[in-house]
Amino acid sequence: VLSPRENETLTFLALGYSRAQVAHTLCISENTLRVYIESARYKLGAANTTHAVSLAVSRGLILL
């Protein structure tokens, strides 16, 4: 259900990257990154970013 970019974003966050590192790695602004995170949170019904990462991992949406 996650877009490829939302998936990449949550994967990097799960691996311990900071938001700045994720944005740099994906060649996007931190504002754009925030939009991807918020969209993923909404789709997953997560309360925060950590919860979104946890849900994505537990549902098998991202592999570590």
Predicted regions and their residues:
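Short, basic, alpha-helical segments at the C-terminal edge of helix-turn-helix-like DNA-binding modules
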Residues: T49-G60
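A cross-family signal for key residues in well-ordered alpha-helices
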Residues: T11, H24, S54
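Short helix-to-turn junction characteristic of helix-turn-helix DNA-binding domains
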Residues: L13-Y17, A56
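Short C-terminal boundary/hinge segments that cap the last helix of small helical domains
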Residues: I62-L64
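Regulatory hinge/linker segments at domain boundaries
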Residues: V1-E8, F12
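Recognition helix of helix-turn-helix DNA-binding domains
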Residues: S18-H51
